[in-house]
Design a protein with these regions (language model features):
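Hot-dog-fold acyl-thioester-processing enzymes
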Residues: 2-64, 123-147
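Preference for bulky hydrophobic residues occupying beta-strand positions
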Residues: 16-18, 68, 84, 98, ...
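Hydrophobic beta-strand-centered segment that forms part of the acyl-chain substrate-binding groove
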Residues: 45-94, 112-114
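HotDog/MaoC-like acyl-thioester-processing domains
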Residues: 1-12, 73-76, 87-147
Length: 147
């Protein structure tokens, strides 16, 4: 498991409001819900900052790999923030580092969960890999962190 990440390790943040339905029988947010949070922050960034048109644009991003390490439980009604960065920016794909933080934490408090997503950009019609659109690439470039 990678070392715990802090907010300082991320470049973009999105508030996440937990919902009653996110909790499972054990009284904490269920593991699958974290992937929804990951997907939400990545796509929010692509749409709002990169101009990706998910409804009619010729290019879309598909998740081809994901992982998550859980470090501390959260539960409704916790308020969270999802942190996003770019760990690797290729010609047709991007690897995001993503972490979830409990709001109210200080800057150096560790993430409650952290992981990654790999998006491959494809032609909407035939699903073949294509180059990341220039506007999207420019936005992603702002999130790149040094290895």
């Amino acid at each position: 498991m990678a070392d715990p990440q802090t907010r300082a390790d991320y470049r973009y943040f999105l508030p996440i409001t937990t919902r009653w339905m996110d909790n499972d029988l054990y009284g904490h947010v269920n593991n699958v819900t974290y992937y929804s949070y990951f997907d939400t922050v990545a796509n929010h960034f692509l749409i709002t900052e990169g101009g990706l048109d998910i409804h009619t644009g010729p290019v879309i991003g598909l998740v081809v790999e994901s992982a998550c390490s859980y470090r501390a439980p959260v539960a409704y009604p916790d308020e969270l923030s999802a942190g996003l960065r770019v760990d690797k920016l290729g010609n047709r794909s991007v690897t995001y580092g993503i972490a979830i933080f409990r709001d109210g934490q200080v800057t150096d408090d560790p993430a409650v969960a952290q992981g990654h997503f790999v998006h491959v950009f494809v032609d909407r019609a035939d699903r073949r890999a294509v180059a990341i659109p220039d506007q999207v690439r420019a936005a992603l470039q702002r999130l790149v962190v040094a290895p």
